[in-house]
Amino acid sequence: MDQLIQLVEATQQRNDIPEVRPGDTVRIQLKVIEGEKERLQAFEGVVIGDKGMGASKTITVRKISHGVGVERIIPVNSPNIESVTVVRSGKARRAKLFYLRKRTGKAALKVKERKSASAEA
């Protein structure tokens, strides 16, 4: 039974999505269907948490829009995702960055930047 579940999940996994961790700033291009029209909508924000694994993995992305915090829970393996780009890698000491919800202004998006391996060499 377990092998059957793994087989089904393996077919639903997407390999074109980069590894995203809490603290990273990401830009996600989502397909939005309005009536008969289809367009792309960009959502850029800080990943404040991830949940699940395999085909059911989701990430929570938070951004500040016109002074109001907006969070969106996005299934990583959704067919509505056109692309995911890591704009900035953040260094977080927690798995869930819910403390960012209490912050306002620029402090709400402030996460230390992670040094990349290529920058050190």
Swiss-Prot record:
<comment type="similarity">
    <text>Belongs to the bacterial ribosomal protein bL19 family.</text>
</comment>
<protein>
    <recommendedName>
        <fullName>Large ribosomal subunit protein bL19</fullName>
    </recommendedName>
</protein>
<keyword id="KW-0687">Ribonucleoprotein</keyword>
<dbReference type="InterPro" id="IPR038657">
    <property type="entry name" value="Ribosomal_bL19_sf"/>
</dbReference>
<comment type="function">
    <text>This protein is located at the 30S-50S ribosomal subunit interface and may play a role in the structure and function of the aminoacyl-tRNA binding site.</text>
</comment>
<dbReference type="GO" id="GO:0003735">
    <property type="term" value="F:structural constituent of ribosome"/>
</dbReference>
<dbReference type="InterPro" id="IPR001857">
    <property type="entry name" value="Ribosomal_bL19"/>
</dbReference>
<dbReference type="GO" id="GO:0006412">
    <property type="term" value="P:translation"/>
</dbReference>
<dbReference type="InterPro" id="IPR008991">
    <property type="entry name" value="Translation_prot_SH3-like_sf"/>
</dbReference>
<dbReference type="InterPro" id="IPR018257">
    <property type="entry name" value="Ribosomal_bL19_CS"/>
</dbReference>
<keyword id="KW-0689">Ribosomal protein</keyword>
<dbReference type="Pfam" id="PF01245">
    <property type="entry name" value="Ribosomal_L19"/>
</dbReference>
<dbReference type="GO" id="GO:0022625">
    <property type="term" value="C:cytosolic large ribosomal subunit"/>
</dbReference>
